[in-house]
Amino acid sequence: MSLADKVLAVNNDLPIRSTQPVHSGKVRSVYWLTESDSRRLIAEKGYNVAADAPLAIMVISDRISAFDCIWHAEGGMNGVPGKGAALNAISNHWFKLFKDQGLADSHILDIPHPLVWIVQKARPVMIEAICRQYITGSMWRAYEKGEREFCGIEIADGLKKDQKLPELLTTPSTKGILEGIPGVAAVDDVNITRQNIEDNFAAFNFTTTQDIALYEKLLKEGFNVISHELAKIGQIFVDTKFEFGYVKDKAGNEKLIYMDEVGTPDSSRIWDAAEYQKGNIVENSKEDFRQLLLNHFPDPDILLNKDRMAERSDLAKNNALPAAVLMKISATYISIAEKIIGHKITLSDNPKAEIIEILDRQYGLID
């Protein structure tokens, strides 16, 4: 079996029993379970949720997305070996730590396989909750052009690229396209201020205005927990994106939880601390892949200019990258995951077959 065969590139074709269409994202696919299967699993497994809570199977792939496109390599390699397992392992680690430290729960109820979560359906807060500890990336590019206000926060003059910010900044953006909100453009991923959120809290799916402060508290506390733990293994937590949502517990009480993924190389920038002290930036995140792409193609503006999205899509579809590029990313993801969780990650030889067998034999979910 070749390495390409071990990559789970297509994750929306599993024979999981469902009456709804599979929701396929850039990396994950979600299978909504039937009401009867949800109720059965809640009773059989003792999940701490309401008896009628909707459940889903969330399957992560090894696909890699950057600049809003999915990339592939030569030799039929349509993903990064070990990427999905690494991302899930990291998120599992941080979610458990958050819960153990009394921050908040996550949407995950069960982990049948390294690539699979059983989750409780949440009502998402429509905000990409971004936290920044260093000035880099898009924030630096805007700062370099003279911008000094970010999401309603004034930034001082005199900052240098990649330096640590005077304080941890929350710079939220919209999750998807939100229409009809005064002062907020109806485009994907647009920066918003705290005032925007306060004035339109219901449009962002907050239940109360008090929950805005709670989301900010959970964001900053979660960031600090991860930053503290990464420092122990010689890594810097540069910036990240969290997502939040509401679920109901077994008693029917609504609570705000962490969801999606947290502290992964896909959702965060992570730098090597020793190299940073020497003045070098060594990425242990997807930012490394983004830089590889920018250096690989002769016209990087295609990747950065949103007005050239059609060209960018063609570029990703019609250009197989050298296999070594995806293998380098594989090594980065697996290495940082193993440092974080403290043990080796075992990769599946045939992930799709393994997932189907487990969901059939242990959960009775395969038709």
Curated annotation (Swiss-Prot):
Superkingdom of this protein's organism: Bacteria
GO MF terms, alphabetically ordered: ATP binding; phosphoribosylaminoimidazolesuccinocarboxamide synthase activity
Record CDD domains: SAICAR_synt_Sc
Cited Pfam families: SAICAR_synt (PF01259)
SUPFAM superfamilies: SAICAR synthase-like
Class of the enzyme per the UniProt entry, highest EC level: ligase
InterPro entries assigned to the protein according to its UniProt record, in alphabetical order: SAICAR_synt/ADE2_N (IPR028923), SAICAR_synthase_Vibrio-typ (IPR014106)
Record family assignment: Belongs to the SAICAR synthetase family.
Name of the featured protein: Phosphoribosylaminoimidazole-succinocarboxamide synthase
Gene that produces this protein: purC
